[in-house]
Amino acid sequence: MTEQYHRWHSPNLNLDLEMLVFGDRGFPVILFPTTKGRYHQNKDFGLIDCVKWFVDEGLVKIYCPDTIDDLSWYNKGIHPADRARNYSWYDKMLVEELAPWAMHETGVNKVAVAGCSFGGYHAANFAFKHPEMVSHLFTMGGAFDIKMFTDGFYNDDIFYNNPVDFLPGSNKPELWQMNIILGTSEHDMCKDYNIRMSNILNEKNMNHWLDIRPFAKHDWPIWKEMFPHYLSTIK
């Protein structure tokens, strides 16, 4: 399995970002880390190894970028407005830098996005905000309501980065063309977030699969079962 390391200066964030890329061809998949995880986390915890076959067969090319959790939602040392503004710049980086990069390299005009736990938030927020750029959304143990990080403060930056708030009123036609899988499990602490998101999608008649696995907890073993299954749905 080929692996490449990239470091670049993001003009949208005005800081350096790092990323690992696995594979040399195939459908582009942007895979986000969990809470405060770095670009190498999904490799370190075995999530990349569990989909090695898809990479080796040239079916997918997986992009594992850094996030800015410490500069945005998890930074209690700055005002919630600053947390939200920083995250809006991160979203702009995805739109203007990373997603076009992945599409250009693979020759595909959309990306798949995925993530476990808080990585599921990153994936869902990007997919639902920019469905014109996303064909597949795979979340595993995701949570989708960012208001728990805003100390009661609320503004437009929070609204437009909170899927449970902006999605009900969005009518972008590409939303109904997306392949959406919400993966959770019986003992997942984020199960209720997934049920709530599924209800929102049902109210909008958006086709999706709410995959609730029995017995499992909010942890890597069940996510490593889910991820190859979900990648197999990419056509």
Model regions: which residues?
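Non-catalytic cap/lid and distal C-terminal segments of serine-dependent acyl enzymes
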Residues: M1-K235
